[in-house]
Amino acid sequence: MPTLAAILHTLDPFIVQFTPSFGLRWYGLLYASGLLCAWMIMRAVARRGRAGLTQRQVDDFITEVVIGVVVGARLGHALIYDRVLFTTFTPSFPFWELLAVHKGGLSSHGGMAGLLVVCWRFARRSGASFRTLLDLCCISAPPGLCLGRMANWINGELWGRPLPQDLQANAPWWCVKYPREVFEPSFDPSRLEPLRPLVHAGDDLQQAVVAAAYAGDAKVQAALEPLLTAFWPSNFFQAFTDGPVLAVVVWIVWLRRPAPGVATASFLVAYGLLRFITEQFREPDAGVNTLLGLTSPMLISVSMVVCGVVMAGRCRAAYRTVRDGSTGGS
């Protein structure tokens, strides 16, 4: 019985390309779309009087959120996954690799840390409730998190783990294969020799095969696909859990009008648990530290769950104290 082919990643990260390394990318467009969604949600909540901010204040707040998220996400990526970015300089713009955000490399954990700083600063300056601002951000974040994972997919980054060996020979239709695997040290380039007649290859057969595959050459794609490893579609898993699933959890909590900060606590617990689960299917980045078999993202996710549980308890206790005090004084 014939089976559907695996998902072969041949997406172009550029929408419009001006030079080999510069152009309008899907990565940036999707991140901008996520922030636009957050702004629209915040304004809608403000119109209903539950944001703790006016609509004009929301406009000021989202501007700072954009800066905080991008800076935090980039620094988080460099600290957790790729510290060499701090010391790498190039002759081309933007000269310092840490600033080369257009190439990808934004950490969701880092973005959340940046968001925390923004909420704290804005609350102190405006007099708004810090916990209410956090809640506002948490109910607005899932669309951006989902789109961020799809941006990772289009960029061909953050691969999943290889499927078990017994599934490699007859890989299921939902698995993902990456032509760029031929550049990995573990891939034997001699396996590509049967494809040489299909491409215009000089000395660099690997580059020619990958270029043809991404250019849409069906014959090259068909010949290359069986040679590639089948990976878990971790980008899709995390897009689903970080987006629709997380949104449902946080919005159910928020719509019940809990104490300020409880929606944030539910976000921390839900995101931490979901991220920990989906990280089991994601290939750890090279150089990422591990402790007791857990990668840095897993450890951070566990910390988020613990912080969420503690925060929920403290928020409810503080809310009861205020409520009882108000009742007693009436």
What kind of feature is each model-predicted range?
Residues 1-330:
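A feature for loop-to-transmembrane-helix boundaries and adjacent hydrophobic helices
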